[in-house]
Amino acid sequence: MADSPIPSARPARFSRRDAGLGVDPGADLPAGLAAHLAAHLSAVDRPIAAARGLPNAAYTAAEFHRFERAHLFARAWTALAFCADHATPGRVTPVDFMGWPLLIACARDGRPTVFHNVCSHRGRRLVDAPKTTGGLLVCPYHAWAYDLSDASGGLKSTPHIGGVGAHQADGFCRAAHGLKAVRSHCWLGVLFIDLSGDAPAFEEYAAPLVARYRPYLGAAMDGGAAAAEALASPAADAGLTLEAECNWKLAVENYCEAYHLPWIHPSLNDYSPLQDHYAVIVSEDFAGQGTRTFRPALGTGTGDGDGDGDGAGAGDGDGVGGDGDGVGDGGSDGDGAGDGALPEFPDWPAAQRETAEYPVFYPNLLLGFQVNHFFALIIRPLAAGRIREEVRLFYTGDGAHAARCQAARAANLAAWTRVFSEDISAVEGMQRGRQSPGFGGGVFSPAMDAPTHHFHRWVARKYRAALGGGGGCGGDGDGDSNGE
């Protein structure tokens, strides 16, 4: 990684016509807010030394939560869940996505499919709690039933639709009224959705990230069966959930930069100092930061390194990679062969074992790549000023399940938990600051904030497109990977 320089979900049966987005009458901003936003966007796009950040209302106004749901999250590949949590055939799980009811169903082949969680008949929510079905999902209201055995979601049964005892009706076509599928894809153990149906193919969208990191993680970056064999996440000691009283964008912004390292993560800064970190601009849709001093051999399973990375939704980019995660190493001797050591990705170049990078997959997935593990952190916006973060650690080889690695895994999780938690006060403090009329979006350090400015410009392009000012979905915009 030069300086700035799991089985797939089913795509079958997806139809843009039935994507389910429709028109959200509350998705557009009130005229006053829209004008306020439009007036600020040009300042975001200035060269970084003269640029301004997004206005306070984008972080505090409830109207923006709905606006971003429809015009930003729904029109890009967005992280929804972890694939391994939805790999039990017949299992159905309801998921609230920023107020929209969805369901994740697992078909016979173990692959997850996403649908809108609503009956085609009278709009009753179909699934209220996780449950296992026999392949048929029955609405609790009028018992209309949908086929989940092959992930089609087809409408199979309509009791008494034509009158008592008449289960079919003239002119009614069951085939036209199945569950409404949501376009989805599994990659790196994460289940992504495209609610609009208009985003580029996932493989096209993620291609810049795959190209950058495949030389390090190998088959893990490819998806499908090869990735499932290359990666694993243990059932225990592999994840955590945190909540913070902040807007989701502040979590992303904090993750993008290492500038705060000396003050928020001082112990990490002792052995992975700020000067060892660098900006990572992958493409228009992905940016973050990296470190040159992730040292696997530091870990002893006792947590001497802080990891750091990116915290509770407010990561720090330099992440565990910063080295601290050393703890996550459990005493690795560098090649994963030592007792208790976590195996290392076999393709990772030996000359760059101390390099780690922390890109953001916009809008809501924080990634951390280290020689002996990687993590994925999904940010769930719950309200304009509240988020939940779900973190999962992944290992290669037998690192996820071998008893000899148990202490290393537990130490790694403890280190990341400590690091993520350290960032909560920072992002919550920024959220409170957004209530001040004395703050108008802030400014950027040309040396330290390039990825943060990159993210602001990405958001601004989405806003501008929603307001009718151009810039589309996916690889839209003017490309801001230069001059930041």
List the predicted regions and their residue ranges.
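Rieske [2Fe-2S] iron-sulfur-binding domain
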Residues: 85-197, 201-208
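Short low-complexity stretches enriched in small and charged residues
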Residues: 32-35, 57-61, 142-143, 301-302, ...
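Short Pro/Gly-enriched beta-strand edge/turn motifs at strand-loop
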Residues: 74-85, 160-168, 358-363
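N-terminal pre-ligand scaffold of iron-sulfur
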Residues: 2-129, 183-185
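C-terminal catalytic domain of Rieske-type non-heme iron oxygenases
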Residues: 3-21, 106, 111, 117, ...
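Membrane-associated scaffolding surfaces of BAR-superfamily helical dimers
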Residues: 479
